[in-house]
Structures are given as C-alpha cells and as structure tokens.
From Swiss-Prot:
This is Octanoyltransferase. Its EC number is 2.3.1.181. The keyword Transferase applies. Keywords: Acyltransferase, Cytoplasm, Transferase. Changing residue 169 to S: Loss of activity. It is found in: Cytoplasm. Coiled coil: none annotated. It holds the Pfam family LplA-B_cat.
Amino acid sequence: MYQDKILVRQLGLQPYEPISQAMHEFTDTRDDSTLDEIWLVEHYPVFTQGQAGKAEHILMPGDIPVIQSDRGGQVTYHGPGQQVMYVLLNLKRRKLGVRELVTLLEQTVVNTLAELGIEAHPRADAPGVYVGEKKICSLGLRIRRGCSFHGLALNVNMDLSPFLRINPCGYAGMEMAKISQWKPEATTNNIAPRLLENILALLNNPDFEYITA
C-alpha cells in the first residue's frame, strides 16, 4: 500500500542543467508507488527561458548563459542566494489540480514571508508572489503523466542586478525584491526550513525524510 511520505532533498548549489535533467528522468520513470519528492537547491547564475518564452524578453544576457526550459512562463534568472524549490508530486494521487498546486505554492511563500513580518500577495494577472508591486518569488511548472515538476524560486539574499538584463517573466520594467531588503539576516539556510515547513503543512503534514546531497 502507498505510504504518504515525501523525500526532501537538500542539493546545495548546483548547475541548472543536470538538475533539470534529473527532474525529467525522475518524472519519466516514476510510477504509482513512487514517493513524491521536494528538491531544495540554489543554482549558479543562469537565465532560463520558459516554454512560451519570447526572445525579445532577453535584453542583454552578457556572460550569463541562457538555457531553454520546458516549464511554463517566460524568462527568469536563477543565482546564488535564491531558494529554488522543485515539487515532484503525483497530483492525481494527491487529488490536486494544476491551479490548486499553483495556489498552494503561492500560499507557501505568502505564509513563509508572513512569519518574517513581510506582507506579500499573489497576483491574478501574473503568477508568483509580490511585496507591493515588486516580485519576490517566481513560479513555473510542468505537468507530465499527472505529475508535477519544476516549481518556485524565492529571492532571499541574492544579487538582483541580473534581472535588469531581462524582462522578468515577460514584464518590461518589472521590479524585483528579496527577503534581505526587510530581513538582512536572511539566508537560504534559514529560509529553506521555513519554506519546507509551510508547504508540508499545506500538503496536510505528510511524513518526510530529509536527505542531504
């Protein structure tokens, strides 16, 4: 019988492409008995272009590589100091629709930021989480065979300047924010556990096993 348990992998700082490839392989080979997984990772500097991404939104990438991704959404930036959380969930088994998963991920971030005294909100016209008009978390998913992969990227204490080289998520002039603007002591090390606790709460507190790379 299937046990509701999630494997949580803390992967540290990693290049984007091998992690993306591993996500695909996991999703392609999983079956109904495979445990769901959540991967916590930071990436070396990279722009990723979503499936519907338009080249004109990449203004001047310079020395930062641009990699095509099959997630939803437009171009975004990943770099050290940004907490990425990939959600490898069997949606059918969890009785979750895609829209419900998006809402759950946004609420995970809103709840995490609320614990820090930062008031944040999602936007109906542009997926992600915002503080005022500034975007603090990007979101992009792919569903294959009823299972999700990709996830969210929360700006913690990263260098935001590379976002100026693109139209983030396809919005010209979109301003970005990071947690350390309000909480200078914030790091991915102290934000990741909060993020994990909040998503597990919204998934009805399944058992989980923590695995470090």
